[in-house]
Amino acid sequence: MSKSTAEIRQAFLDFFHSKGHQVVASSSLVPHNDPTLLFTNAGMNQFKDVFLGLDKRNYSRATTSQRCVRAGGKHNDLENVGYTARHHTFFEMLGNFSFGDYFKHDAIQFAWELLTSEKWFALPKERLWVTVYESDDEAYEIWEKEVGIPRERIIRIGDNKGAPYASDNFWQMGDTGPCGPCTEIFYDHGDHIWGGPPGSPEEDGDRYIEIWNIVFMQFNRQADGTMEPLPKPSVDTGMGLERIAAVLQHVNSNYDIDLFRTLIQAVAKVTGATDLSNKSLRVIADHIRSCAFLIADGVMPANENRGYVLRRIIRRAVRHGNMLGAKETFFYKLVGPLIDVMGSAGEDLKRQQAQVEQVLKTEEEQFARTLERGLALLDEELAKLSGDTLDGETAFRLYDTYGFPVDLTADVCRERNIKVDEAGFEAAMEEQRRRAREASGFGADYNAMIRVDSASEFKGYDHLELNGKVTALFVDGKAVDAINAGQEAVVVLDQTPFYAESGGQVGDKGELKGANFSFAVEDTQKYGQAIGHIGKLAAGSLKVGDAVQADVDEARRARIRLNHSATHLMHAALRQVLGTHVSQKGSLVNDKVLRFDFSHNEAMKPEEIRAVEDLVNTQIRRNLPIETNIMDLEAAKAKGAMALFGEKYDERVRVLSMGDFSTELCGGTHASRTGDIGLFRIISESGTAAGVRRIEAVTGEGAIATVHADSDRLSEVAHLLKGDSNNLADKVRSVLERTRQLEKELQQLKEQAAAQESANLSSKAIDVNGVKLLVSELSGVEPKMLRTMVDDLKNQLGSTIIVLATVVEGKVSLIAGVSKDVTDRVKAGELIGMVAQQVGGKGGGRPDMAQAGGTDAAALPAALASVKGWVSAKLQ
């Protein structure tokens, strides 16, 4: 009996655990502090800083089953999903990693044992082929002489992509940074399936399928292309869970494994589809995985960056549901079946199920309102099409008006063998191109990053003043031995009381000083295991090895501590008031304000905001002790400690508790007791994205200052209204009612004046070929009154053409009216367009009524004078 996908995942982790590897949980799909990535797309992403030497772990061997997304940016599989056997937007990457521990020999032997041992995957050895980089003789000999694979099944792959080291078998993190040769393992499905071995002309067939890639990181590529050997070579491997499941379950398509069969049946059930071979079922089954896990990891549908990619995937899935005949919202209903089929890998998703379902449902409802109209427009355009290419302007209009991503339009067109002019689409979408570049233009030169071999010891929990030693200096990212007065630099110490920005809390400010120098610290940041003090040398000189006294700005740190502790109280209060679906999506804690982003699908009601404020202030008055404990990450989670969004944690974590009210993982600085906070006030609540709200609040002296400011404003208003705070609301209501009455009377007077003006104007009309023509510029008339005047004049004059204009604050307003019996010869829209063009504007409207605006008031007299000639020509 073949193993289930869940059993295969667990077997992989168990095997490497038995080989001394630390089992590490999957990291977020949103890369932590990595500007080079749109989404986590490989198992090694969470270990990138370890491979770069910027981070150290308490283990040298690791194994993971990493959730990955490839849709957008460099790795974009979206358009192929559902149409091939192995493309996905979401997949799990099984991997084992060595950080300067074992290398080629053990990595190859581990892979062979797992794949072929009867105890593990028991694949037939004769079905396995391998590739190595052309010059990697070491790997070749291990496969041939130690593993025993015949030479004919070991294939050398050279530089097959047009440049040195540009090869399927040479892995590179980027243009610079760690890289090295790799060996890939392929499974031969048999000669009943078309395809040839890797490196052959038929290699794109489905007979030989890559199942495992083992990368040997042994070089550091410099900007000039030279390869420097790494002091500690490492190993990074990746095996797609879905691919190995297909092999072990004896099926040729990933969509035929147990996990996808279950999801496809769930999709069919919620959409009413009966043909289980329909490709739309595969598309939706894939897309629910990426969408659900992206939302669970904090990504929300939006019009830029990661949120835009998510929106594209959701809308593609909804469109395929529409094709299957779904009559109502369906996509969110697949979250439950997904959680069931993911097993232990779906635990994070299960905790946020309600929030994920709500976001998907809201997005689908919004798109459903325009989908039908958009598809109808596309059908119209395709019906008129004479060639085989849809123009880019139409594709852009679908995007701009109906929210159709161009790949969705391309999807529809592909089903009818029609191409989309994507170049034309891009040309018509300049602003969106800017957004797309922001979304996918992630890139960095790893060798330009500050690298510090030493670590800094943070002692700021207990000290605000400390003596330390300079271990490194950096100017413009480059290490230097000394700096002089006036230079900006990053100073690294062996130990420091300065807190480096992390977990939403800003870095400390302060001073590093000695007998002959003073360095003003404006910010503090982490660089791997080192803490960098960023600032400017105000006086003297400073060199590596110097002793310094590090003084944190104590008053600023105190305010930050209060705000950070209040953030924890507010998080717990929000979950009590709004529900346990609330989870942190981002935060900023500085010395002036605390800002907290959280998952919630609607604006908070005033009474909810008040309830949160009251609950937090109640905990402040309780004067709860704020305590910290260091424990294992899993033990902390079992205790119910909440983790911060987007934060990366070590195996040992700091757990912060505030009595029985709040327990969170946090490395920040905090008050000693909740009573130290003094007072908490919410100053704003707003939305930042679909399903994400933001609260800004103040504490302590800052909160008291807002109370005083509110009181001062109230007193000022009371003084202006000649009342006091006790009857202020009644006074305001009285003033508003009086204002409304006066505005009504004023409007009546304006209408009377306009009617009188219309009566006066009618006598100025002239006859042009039997039609009354009236053209006039009016002074002191509001633009919105022009329409009423035109209606009155049309009633008075009969067969008529009218053009009225007024100038307010330098802006021209125009209106044209044409009686219906004349519209076959003169159209108001054409007439107003002719006049508007002369005053720097444009406009339009119906044949009988049109409006326009302009910016060139000086040109108005000449423009109005041109009307008679234009009308005369039309009426001949």
Curated annotation (Swiss-Prot):
Compartments, record wording: Cytoplasm
Domain of life the protein comes from: Bacteria
The enzyme's E.C. designation: 6.1.1.7
GO terms, molecular function: alanine-tRNA ligase activity; aminoacyl-tRNA deacylase activity; ATP binding; tRNA binding; zinc ion binding
Coiled coil spans: none
Main location: cytoplasm
Binding-site positions, Zn(2+): 564, 568, 666, 670
GO cellular component terms attached to this protein's record: cytosol
Alphabetical list of PROSITE patterns matching this protein: AA_TRNA_LIGASE_II_ALA
Family according to the record: Belongs to the class-II aminoacyl-tRNA synthetase family.
HAMAP family on file: Ala_tRNA_synth_B (MF_00036_B)
Protein name: Alanine--tRNA ligase
Native source organism of the sequence: Escherichia coli (strain ATCC 8739 / DSM 1576 / NBRC 3972 / NCIMB 8545 / WDCM 00012 / Crooks)
Taxonomic classification: Bacteria, Pseudomonadati, Pseudomonadota, Gammaproteobacteria, Enterobacterales
